[in-house]
Curated annotation (Swiss-Prot):
Enzyme class: oxidoreductase
Superkingdom: Eukaryota
Highest classification ranks of the organism: Eukaryota, Fungi, Dikarya, Basidiomycota, Agaricomycotina
Catalytic activity, EC: 1.14.13.9
InterPro entries according to UniProt: FAD-bd (IPR002938), FAD/NAD-bd_sf (IPR036188), Kynurenine_monooxygenase (IPR027545)
Cofactor(s) required for function per UniProt: FAD
Organism annotation: Cryptococcus neoformans var. neoformans serotype D (strain JEC21 / ATCC MYA-565) (Filobasidiella neoformans)
Record-given protein name: Kynurenine 3-monooxygenase
Catalytic reaction list: L-kynurenine + NADPH + O2 + H(+) = 3-hydroxy-L-kynurenine + NADP(+) + H2O
GO BP annotation list: 'de novo' NAD biosynthetic process from L-tryptophan; anthranilate metabolic process; kynurenine metabolic process; L-tryptophan catabolic process; quinolinate biosynthetic process
Start-end of Basic and acidic residues biased regions: 162-171
Main function: Catalyzes the hydroxylation of L-kynurenine (L-Kyn) to form 3-hydroxy-L-kynurenine (L-3OHKyn). Required for synthesis of quinolinic acid.
Keyword field contains Disulfide bond: no
GO molecular function, one term: FAD binding
Associated pathway: Cofactor biosynthesis; NAD(+) biosynthesis; quinolinate from L-kynurenine: step 1/3
Length: 506
């Protein structure tokens, strides 16, 4: 009889999703090894160039995923985060308008630094998890279940001597690393996904939007409490239809700003003078707070990023490979669900492994196909597919809402309708999450806003949130048609009142 051994999983990518996956499977009793191309983020001297500066918005789905692995991690992250209770819309005339995310329940999303989130998650991994940084996946031999890597190695290892790029050499991993399961958590340009597509028929699509993003920053100002020159408990938006600027608060009183602008418009801002005129015309309040020089210096030196939607189906192959996070479903950032969805992938996978009674040990030879694990991974891919398609669609929809629709009277009217109907026809309380069932609320009853379902209801799948919103939108449209037939006068008075408020605000 074959001897029992722990299952061996190789996780490629030590970002937030990869680190949580490693901790989750370690807690389940698997033998875990993690490869990461970048430097170890745990050291204080971690290279800033290896730490993406963009802030992350973590909400209920992400927090619930963290709690499912270790409740203390979620609470520790909340201490590092800044709650944001709504959007603060900055109009061109300088007026500001608060739009609460949850006007009835008062729930918030949370701004947290990506480097801090990543460092804390990697720091939470025990010594039993084998971490290999500066390790780049070269190729995977799926026939023999072996992965090969190249490594950056230091030629000088004297104590206290700083590492330099020119002291690093790439060396090939000649022996390779055998595995039972390889998990690709290596982002939008996943090498694990590329290897899987060579081994199996996988549908893959990618679509770029015409906008670039550029990271800017608003320094802390000691003249204000805590250094915050703007309300720290809002996500700040300067919507300008074709483009927009957003700002998320940091713990030190600064704000991380991101400009989203069409490449075609960006090409016209080819001089410092033209860029200065652009910011003064469209974002005068931001220029006043940040300072023109700081804003323009950031604009000139910081890279232009692409925004892409990626879908991959199926996301699993046999019992040997699966994709999580951006490797499977990269999305544009306008719903703030990229991180939350990726972390939720980990919770859903763990739930399905539990449901299929996948033991952390096996008597199969290392790399041998496991029919039971294959069924579990297929179940994950099949069940998750609809939700991933839905959130990618919703993120694209919110791309238009944030830069344009938030300025529309119809947007304000719909928010008021949601508030009234939510009060009159309250949805059932959030169902308790189960280890065996990731989304216990199969059908949302009553009335609740799309934003609440997506952001604050981890018991509801994204596809159900989209289905419910389509139904509610039809109800609002039908009610509006009936109102137009039987209550033209009343509707006219209401419309005039809304228009008056709109004009006063503008």
């Amino acid at each position: 009889m074959s001897q029992s051994r722990a299952r061996k999983v190789l996780i490629v990518g030590a970002g937030p999703v990869g680190a949580l996956t490693a901790l989750s499977l370690h807690r389940r009793g698997w033998e875990v090894e993690v490869w990461e191309t970048r430097d170890d983020p745990r050291g204080q001297d971690a290279a800033p160039s290896n730490l993406r500066s963009i802030n992350l918005a973590i909400s209920s789905r992400g927090l619930e995923a963290l709690r499912s692995v270790d409740p203390s991690i979620a609470e520790n992250f909340l201490e590092e985060a800044i709650p944001m209770k709504g959007r603060m819309i900055h109009h061109t005339d300088g007026k500001q308008e608060s739009q609460l995310y949850d006007p009835i329940g008062g729930q918030s999303i949370n701004s947290i630094s990506r480097p801090i989130l990543n460092q804390r998650l990697v720091q939470s991994l025990p010594e039993a998890v084998k971490l290999r940084f500066n390790t780049k996946l070269k190729h995977i031999d799926f026939k023999n279940r072996v992965a090969y890597a190249s490594h950056k190695q230091e030629t000088s290892l004297l104590p206290g001597e700083e590492s330099e790029k020119d002291k690093k050499q790439n060396t090939e991993d000649e022996d390779g690393t055998a595995f039972d399961l390889v998990i690709g958590c290596d982002g939008s340009w996943s090498k694990v996904r590329t290897a899987m597509m060579r081994a199996e028929r996988i549908d893959f699509s990618q679509s770029f939007i015409p906008h670039a993003y550029i990271e800017l920053h608003m320094p802390s100002d000691p003249a204000f409490p805590g250094g915050y020159a703007m309300d720290k408990n809002h996500l700040h938006i300067w919507p300008r239809h074709a483009f927009m600027l957003i700002g998320l608060p940091n713990k030190d009183g600064s704000f991380t700003l991101t400009l989203f602008i069409p490449f075609s418009s960006l090409e016209l801002l080819d001089t410092r003078e033209s860029a200065a005129a652009f910011f003064r015309e469209h974002f005068p309040s931001a220029v006043d707070i940040v300072g023109e020089k700081v804003l323009l210096d950031d604009f000139e030196k910081n890279p232009r990023g692409n925004l892409v939607t990626i879908n991959c189906t199926p996301s699993a192959w046999s019992s040997h490979a699966i994709l999580l996070g951006d490797a499977s479903h990269s999305m544009v950032p306008f719903y703030g669900q990229g991180l939350n969805c990726g972390l939720e992938d980990v919770r859903v996978l763990s739930s399905i492994l539990e449901r299929h009674h996948i033991s952390p040990t096996t008597t199969l030879a290392l790399g041998e196909t496991d029919p039971e694990l294959e069924l579990a991974l297929k179940a994950y891919s099949d069940e998750r597919q609809g939700d991933l398609k839905a959130i990618c669609e919703l993120a694209l929809q919110n791309y238009t809402e944030m830069r344009s629709h938030v300025l529309s009277p119809l947007h304000h009217l719909r928010r008021q309708v949601d508030k009234v109907f939510t009060t009159l026809f309250r949805s059932a309380p959030q169902a308790t999450l189960s280890l065996m069932e990731p989304f216990p609320t199969k059908k949302v009853r009553g009335w609740t806003s799309l934003y609440e379902m997506v952001t604050f209801r981890p018991d509801v799948g994204y596809s159900e949130a989209l289905r419910k919103e389509r139904w509610q939108k039809d109800v609002v449209g039908y009610a509006g048609w009936i109102g137009g037939v039987v209550g033209v006068g009343a509707a006219g008075v209401f419309a005039a009142t809304m228009a008056k408020k709109w004009l006063e605000r503008r």
